[in-house]
From Swiss-Prot:
PANTHER family: QUEUINE TRNA-RIBOSYLTRANSFERASE. Pathway: tRNA modification; tRNA-queuosine biosynthesis. InterPro entries: ArchSynthase1/Queuine_TRR (IPR050076), TGT (IPR004803), TGT-like_sf (IPR036511), tRNA_ribo_trans-like (IPR002616). Residues 245-251, 269-273 are annotated as: RNA binding. GO terms for biological process: queuosine biosynthetic process; tRNA wobble guanine modification; tRNA-guanine transglycosylation. This is Queuine tRNA-ribosyltransferase. One of its GO terms (cellular component) is cytosol. NCBIfam families: Q_tRNA_tgt, tgt_general. It catalyses: 7-aminomethyl-7-carbaguanine + guanosine(34) in tRNA = 7-aminomethyl-7-carbaguanosine(34) in tRNA + guanine. It comes from Citrobacter koseri (strain ATCC BAA-895 / CDC 4225-83 / SGSC4696).
Amino acid sequence: MKFELDTTDGRARRGRLVFDRGVVETPAFMPVGTYGTVKGMTPEEVEATGAQIILGNTFHLWLRPGQEIMKLHGDLHDFMQWKGPILTDSGGFQVFSLGDIRKITEQGVHFRNPINGDPIFLDPEKSMEIQYDLGSDIVMIFDECTPYPADWDYAKRSMEMSLRWAKRSRDRFDGLGNKNALFGIIQGSVYEDLRDISVKGLVEIGFDGYAVGGLAVGEPKEDMHRILEHVCPQIPADKPRYLMGVGKPEDLVEGVRRGIDMFDCVMPTRNARNGHLFVTDGVVKIRNAKHKSDTSPLDAECDCYTCRNYSRAYLHHLDRCNEILGARLNTIHNLRYYQRLMAGLRKAIEEGKLESFVTDFYQRQGRPVPPLNVD
């Protein structure tokens, strides 16, 4: 992988990630394909929304279908027939999400398989091996996602262990002869001094890109913005910056304003299945009765298949009848909305008009622009 940085506007960056499998224009949003599918979508449909890279889930694909079945097909690209690049998370966040049924030690994480209850163990080395078999174009180190809230002492211990795991991840990744990209993950909760130590330690190990982890886990938005404002300038400018698990459209806008290049989140797909649709002027809750006889498109400014062909009334009808097509059409729209938003941000950065774009984005939704505390 090669990262090319074209231009900046304030702290916002316009660039691209270049892979053997294709080019990803940045800032970029990555749809999430947890089990080897972006829920309800074919790879061709995902590509038609404008997505150039997707995310796969190491933890879930390890449990089902497992490494051996994956290798029978080649790798994850062959298994799911996605031709572009794939980023896989390390499994750390999913293990964190297991709560009481897992035990974290210096060696790794002991837990029970949520499918059948069998005891199972995951460590940095195993995570690197699974992601190698998946053929991931971007591999994430195995870390502990520090919960929120966490006091300073706990956050420090967690961050320091994640640094040790980062070195183990790097060593095993190199030992496998993996020629793809490996990203480090910055931890430290909401504490700037801990984030400083994490960034410094990761840069000393050396990675192809750096993710900001441990955000969007319940902390106030002000804390997320503050940490991004503090951390992003410390990440080497020639490396991509990835904000993990984020988020709402406004979170993408605020991340870009602070220097983030990459995002992923289940929100556009999950919300689509619940009839919660993102449009230029905000949000449409399509199951509400007011849409029952509305013949207008979901978003007059959207060029997606759904908006070009169907009315709000039809989408409302499908949702009320629990028709599978409704979830699919909603997903197509939400994914396209996110890609249109990213394309708009990229164009605004190119033209040096980002703050004008941001102002218009919030004005259309009747909301104030959040403060930006950067030099």
